[in-house]
Regions:
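GHKL/Histidine-kinase-like ATPase module
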Residues: 8, 15-17, 23, 27-163
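Flexible active-site lid/hinge loop adjacent to a nucleotide/diphosphate
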Residues: 4
């Protein structure tokens, strides 16, 4: 049985990897057809550029893409996010550059931290009265595009990291 690679699928994955690995340059060439195809992926801005790319068909609600990074016990976390005029949330999680479409503790932790931070800020700055309920996570994440990228040292299993709670509170 012969395996036939789809250049479109490969391009999508190479683009993801280049966004997730700041500064990495990937050159993809397809020489199977008479007319050779070549595409280069290189993003110095990493996941910030990923969010910009994902938001290109929407209007951003603020100019800056918010970016945070941290490292604890061999677990590196990067988050980039920006709200836009859409009504849906688009949060994408990755562990060691592998998409986690079902979510995971890194996504749950991110969403919980985002909701808590917004509500704490709103209370501290009197944007919410004491008698008013907190903003819901769904309302806060409406129109959000976010990338949550977690990188774990190879000698640590994802299960070990989950058990240590490193992906839930960073």
């Amino acid at each position: 049985e012969e395996t036939i690679f789809d250049f479109g699928t490969l391009k999508h994955r190479f683009r993801e990897i280049a966004f997730l690995t700041k500064g990495l340059k990937i050159v993809a060439r397809d020489k199977r057809e008479e007319e050779e195809k070549e595409v280069t992926f290189h993003y110095e801005g990493g996941i910030k550029e990923f969010v910009q790319y994902l938001n290109k068909s929407n209007t951003a609600l603020y100019d800056d893409i918010l970016y945070f990074e941290g490292n604890k016990d061999g677990v590196m976390v990067e988050v980039a996010m920006q709200h836009n005029d859409a009504y849906t949330e688009n949060t994408y999680g990755f562990v060691n550059n592998i998409n986690t479409p079902e979510g995971g503790t890194h996504i749950v932790g991110f969403r919980n931290a985002l909701t808590k931070t917004f509500n704490d800020y709103a209370r501290k700055n009197k944007l919410l009265k004491d008698s008013e309920p907190n903003l819901s996570g769904d309302d806060i994440r409406e129109g959000l595009t976010a990338i949550v990228s977690v990188k774990i040292r190879q000698n640590r299993s994802l299960e070990t990291v989950k058990q240590e709670g490193l992906l839930t509170a960073w």
